[in-house]
Each structure stands twice: as structure tokens, then as C-alpha cells.
Amino acid sequence: MILQNFVVLEGGDGTGTSTQLQILQKRLSGEGGVPTYLRQGAKGGDLNTAWHIPGEGAFPQQARLPTTHFTFEPTDGPIGRLIRQALHRSPALHPTTIAHLFAADRHEHLYGESGIAERCQRGELVICDRYVPSSLVYQGLSCGDDTPAFLNSRFPYPELILFFELDPEIAEQRYRKRDTQDMFEHLAFQKRVHEAYERILPAYCAHGTTLVRIDASLSIEEVAEQVWRALQNLPIFKG
């Protein structure tokens, strides 16, 4: 089943999905915000986003800006917080346990009170940083394809997936600037992630999801424009 009005941002680590979600949140607020970017050197070039709010007509306003909810997975709910702790704990939880936790977090995210499904069905746009494809890729690489495929088989397909494409070596360079250490860090793993995405995404197209590939090697501004153009093709913007 396709869940209309549901948009998902997907890509390997370091491809910029979280940054673009923040940009969309400001742009769809209806304030006419135009992003400017400040690079802070304290942590080796971490990117922080600042916003300049100019006067009327700074960029073309849409005839209709839909009510939009921005979210991410794992969520900041109880199960999502447990996942974040588990990914950084020692000893690590069994990979199959992690896969079950992601599926439980996603079920609540979709069907809990004021969840994704409820919002989409009442005509709101929901934009989510990561969804089922991330589980099929990451948990598939850690515990095999069968378990995450089964756990996520009943969840709806999004109307649109924006896949952020980036050479794994460039993505790894970006990711290392965060100065973090976790199980998803190494370049060889990132190459496997990229290959796994290429393997699973065609199935979404076969089920009716629109897939738009975003060139994440471009500047943040150029990537943001690609994302914005893709969103404008959704029926909810033309209603």
C-alpha cells in the first residue's frame, strides 16, 4: 500500500539527509526563509545552519503550502531513545534484537497517536529522515535480509523517496568530521551500504513509490534546490 503525502529521505551516512530536512522545515514554514551557511571550526568543520529571513518575495511562494510534519527514525520516543543507547553500548545487543526494536519504533511512529499514517490520511505532508529502506539496508547487513524484510513487510510504502547519492569515499570523509565512533563508520561498510540501497530501491518503484535520485555531491544550496523541485511535483502541492 502506498501512503500518500508521505516522503522519505534516504542515503548512507554523511549524505546530508538531516541537513536537508532542517532546510525543508524552514522553507515550508511559510516564512520566506533563505538559508545561509556558517562553518564552525571547533570540531573540524561541522556544518551549522543559520537563517536569514528577508522581506516579502525573497523566493517564489507556493500557491498552497501544505501543513507539514517533519520527523526522523529512530524517533525520539521511548523505543527510539532505547535504540540510540543500544547502538552505542558495550556489549552490543544482538543484531536481531536491534532489528526488532527498529520495527517496534516504526510501528508506533506510524500508528501511534498523531502518527505518520493519521497525519497523511488527514491531508498533511509528512517528511521523514529514514524509514524502512534504512532498516533493510543496515539491519540487513548486520543480521541478514530475512529478518528485517519480515518485520517491515506490513508497513506502507511512501509516496516519494528522495535518495541522496554520494560516492562512499566522500561520504566517509564527511562522516569522520563529526568525530564520532560507532558501528556504521568504516569505509568498507559504507560501500556495502551503497550497494544494498541499489539492490532494494527498485522494489519500491515496482510497488508504485516515486524514486528521485539527489546528487548529494553538490553544494548544500544546490542539493536543497533539487529536493525542493522534487517536492513540488507532489499532488499535495497542486491541490
Language-model segments: which ranges?
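ATP-dependent small-molecule kinase phosphotransfer cores
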Residues: K43-A149
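The start of beta-strands in P-loop NTPase/AAA+ ATPase cores
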Residues: N5, E124-L125, L160
